[in-house]
């Protein structure tokens, strides 16, 4: 809701506002639980359509896409990056 509000408010200034909502990512966040605990890692991988836990590069690639000039028409969107965990 905030993303869309800000996109509408800032759109006339030619400022696009988008957000990303990452799923489970293997990082140091949370003490590295997803990355370092094989049971947690497997449990998460088993409920994603892609069958794996996300990597920081997965999120970075989506953000790089949003920053590219070719994405200039994307505005007010929250992009879920979860490997299909929510399907």
PLM region spans:
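A short hydrophobic alpha-helix cap/turn motif
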Residues: 8-12, 25, 54, 67
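A glycine/serine/threonine-rich, flexible loop-to-helix segment
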Residues: 12, 24-47
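Short-chain dehydrogenase/reductase
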Residues: 3-4, 60-63, 67
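Short C-terminal tail/terminal secondary-structure segment
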Residues: 64, 75-87
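Short, small/polar-rich loop/turn modules that mediate ligand/substrate recognition or access, typified
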Residues: 11, 16, 74-76
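A conserved structural motif in NAD(P)-dependent oxidoreductases
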Residues: 48-59, 70
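Conserved SDR Rossmann-fold cofactor-binding beta-strand/turn motif
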Residues: 16-26, 67-70, 80-82
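Conserved catalytic helix of short-chain dehydrogenase/reductases
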Residues: 1-9
